């Protein structure tokens, strides 16, 4: 099996952007998140502003239209700052958004994806 993964400038920029965001906004509160067992809602808003919550969703449905590699890179950098936030992000992007994209019809996608 050949895993020839092509990393381009877009992926490099994404990695650096998410890493900086995570270091500044997630890492300083990671212990609090784990101790309190509570996810800070403001992080969802910020992740959305970065275009990460619908990273693999086509732009016509309100997403960023990026690859699964981009999703993986974002999750990796978020998880570097907080495994808890990384797991929440992964669940959102793979169990929720991805399933709507893959298994929903156009009407469901148009109604739902832009809001999550």
Where are these regions (language model features)?
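Intrinsic disorder at enzyme termini
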Residues: 1-10
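Short N-terminal secondary-structure initiator segments
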Residues: 1-2, 17-20
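Glycine-rich flavin
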Residues: 13, 20, 25-113
């Amino acid at each position: 099996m050949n895993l020839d993964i092509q990393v381009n400038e877009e992926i490099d920029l994404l990695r650096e952007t998410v890493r900086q965001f995570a270091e500044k906004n997630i890492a300083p509160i990671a212990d609090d998140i784990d101790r309190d067992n509570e996810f800070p809602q403001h992080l969802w808003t910020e992740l959305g502003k970065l275009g990460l919550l619908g990273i693999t969703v086509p732009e016509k449905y309100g997403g960023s239209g990026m690859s699964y590699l981009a999703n993986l890179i974002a999750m990796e950098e978020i998880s570097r700052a907080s495994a808890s936030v990384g797991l929440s992000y992964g669940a959102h992007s793979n169990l929720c958004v991805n399933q709507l994209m893959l298994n929903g019809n156009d009407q469901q996608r148009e109604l739902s994806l832009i809001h999550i």
